Amino acid sequence: MILVFDVGNTNIVLGVYRGKELIENWRIATDKDKSSDEYAMVIHQFFHYNGLNIHDVDDVIISSVVPNIMYSLENASRKLFKREPLIVGSGIKTGMNIKYDDPKQVGADRIVNAIAAYEKYGGPLIIVDFGTATTFCAVSEDGEYLGGAISPGIKISSEALFEKAAKLPRVELINPKKVICKNTVSSMQAGIVYGYIGLVENIVRNMKKELKSSSCKVIATGGLSTLIAGGTDSIDVVDKFLSLDGLNIIYERNRKDRILSNKKS
């Protein structure tokens, strides 16, 4: 079994793979102050309550956009699984040509998503990841990572409205039935959700123009992907586990090197 970690600014998503099959997944809050012992305990409990044995884990791979948390997670991996985790970053085999001005500037999460999407759906394609930030990534027909756009996440936008406007409440993010609303809460929900749908549709439309492909697939992932996809025809597929699948694919591309490295050590 392979354990994968997708570490975002808000949540850490963990997945357990047996071959290509995702057999279990969990989500916990990203906590920079949590110690390696605390993370190890939480992971051990997940395995225990789901009838999985930590001793069956053959290897670990981590993708993170939060550098401050890496020491705790790497140390937790050493304690639980007696091995150094594979970290997605410089020097790792991705199998993807990154056409960015400085490839090191591309977030690991964006590359992981692009690899999974191209492997599963082919190209050209656009990936929209609804996370703390919403990222738009373009992949060519030949599987090249072309770049993309980054905008504030829908929750960040919602919280900013609540924090900066004294009389406006914090609202639940749901898909409103109409745009012309008759109370403050519904009006905010309509403005946030439909405004965000408009943002997505406009960016996707312009990316398709630049790609010179009106037929390229648009894949959505992330916690709020279903909410936004339900209100627009711009999104073709919602793939909740795209990042986890990408990590498993990257691990497989680096498996032989890992085995050789472990034998030498």
UniProtKB/Swiss-Prot annotation:
It is found in: Cytoplasm. It catalyses: (R)-pantothenate + ATP = (R)-4'-phosphopantothenate + ADP + H(+). This is Type III pantothenate kinase. It comes from Alkaliphilus oremlandii (strain OhILAs) (Clostridium oremlandii (strain OhILAs)). Pathway: Cofactor biosynthesis; coenzyme A biosynthesis; CoA from (R)-pantothenate: step 1/5. GO terms for cellular component: cytoplasm. Substrate binds at residues 100, 107-110, 184. InterPro entries: ATPase_NBD, Type_III_PanK. Catalyzes the phosphorylation of pantothenate (Pan), the first step in CoA biosynthesis. GO terms for molecular function: ATP binding; metal ion binding; pantothenate kinase activity.
